[in-house]
């Protein structure tokens, strides 16, 4: 069951909350009429138990049970640290 959970990669845009980070995930979609590729950004709140992620880090997050009103993702790993 654990392998069927959604996994996403994105950039940390906020770490101001305790044990929570905001991760921005960019996806490219094709505009239905103009057929131009358009960048769409979605923000997810993710649980960061040890407060290790910082703004600018590239991270991997995984879907999990509901942790609060807006939070049902958790930090799996930090792929690349910010400079």
UniProtKB/Swiss-Prot annotation:
Keyword presence, Ribonucleoprotein: yes
Keywords, in A-Z order: Ribonucleoprotein, Ribosomal protein, RNA-binding, rRNA-binding
A Gene Ontology biological process term: translation
InterPro entries per the UniProt record, alphabetical: NA-bd_OB-fold, Ribosomal_uS17, Ribosomal_uS17_bact/chlr
GO MF term list: rRNA binding; structural constituent of ribosome
Transmembrane segments annotated in the record for this chain: none
Keyword DNA-binding applies: no
Pfam families: Ribosomal_S17
Highest rank taxon of the organism: Bacteria
Cellular-component GO terms for this entry: cytosolic small ribosomal subunit
Function: One of the primary rRNA binding proteins, it binds specifically to the 5'-end of 16S ribosomal RNA.
Family: Belongs to the universal ribosomal protein uS17 family.
NCBIfam families, per database record: PRK05610.1, uS17_bact
Subunit-level organization: Part of the 30S ribosomal subunit.
The name this protein goes by in its record: Small ribosomal subunit protein uS17
Gene label: rpsQ
